[in-house]
Each structure stands twice: as structure tokens, then as C-alpha cells.
Amino acid sequence: LICYNQLGTKPPTTETCGDDSCYKMIWTYDGVIRRGCGCFTPRGDMPRPRCCKSDKCNL
């Protein structure tokens, strides 16, 4: 699976993942969009990530 992994509004970069999903989320404390491999359950007051299961689905 290929996922985007750039921070915020930087030019898109990708990575090949061993996971079966990609995520995209906006962190509330700094407003920065984060992207990467996998899907996880957030702790505390972190926002829930948007997860998807196809190549480059987290732009």
C-alpha cells in the first residue's frame, strides 16, 4: 500500500507501507494535517484519524 506522509501543506511525498490502511488527521493543538501509514485509536483528546484502504487515498 502506498500512503502520503507529508506534513501540512508541504509538497506531497509517499511511502510504501506494510499496513493495510493510510490515515489523515488534523491535530487540534497545532492545526497541522498529518498523514501516514496505518490506522490507530487516539488517546486522550486527540482527534480520530480518517482512515482508508487504497493506494494514495489519504491526500
Curated annotation (Swiss-Prot):
Pfam families: Toxin_cobra-type. Expressed by the venom gland. It comes from the Eukaryota. A motif (Cell attachment site) lies at residues 43-45. Disulfide bonds join C3-C22, C17-C37, C39-C51, C52-C57. Gene3D superfamilies: CD59. It is found in: Secreted. Keywords: Cell adhesion impairing toxin, Disulfide bond, Hemostasis impairing toxin, Platelet aggregation inhibiting toxin, Secreted, Toxin. SUPFAM superfamilies: Snake toxin-like. GO terms for molecular function: toxin activity. The keyword Metal-binding does not apply. CDD domains: TFP_snake_toxin (cd00206). Inhibits ADP-induced platelet aggregation and inhibits the binding of purified platelet fibrinogen receptor alpha-IIb/beta-3 (ITGA2B/ITGB3) to immobilized fibrinogen. This is Thrombostatin.
